């Protein structure tokens, strides 16, 4: 197991297991079924436009701790910036903290140009296996804050996402219940 190897290589460091994923959201609305009175038909204003923003999540399933970033793209350069920001936020790179970050095999995760900060160690899931990625389970939760809502501009959508992500961050037990699979390694 990769965690054991990291603990052996860094015996005085605390090794933590995190996972990361991205979710594209845009001005094309997220639609949900809703309850309504008998005989009434609920409506949602829709104006299909193809402008996108990306929600990055770094989650530690063992504790429910989560760090969110809203960024304009998903590519090698932006992913490298997200890694740098995350490493600073959690204090990775210090001799006493190492992060094993589990990722899918998106092209921007595996590119040779990815800059991996000191203290972050990448581990890739098998190809085409989103069901193994705990962070994937966060997207229905994040969608709830923007479902059935019309946004004129991306900035409005991003504001709604910020509210939703802050609320979710304050509820680690919910995050943990969605992301901590029974087979996920229990690394303290």
Which functions belong to the PLM regions below?
Residues 1-188:
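Short functional hotspots at interaction and active-site rims
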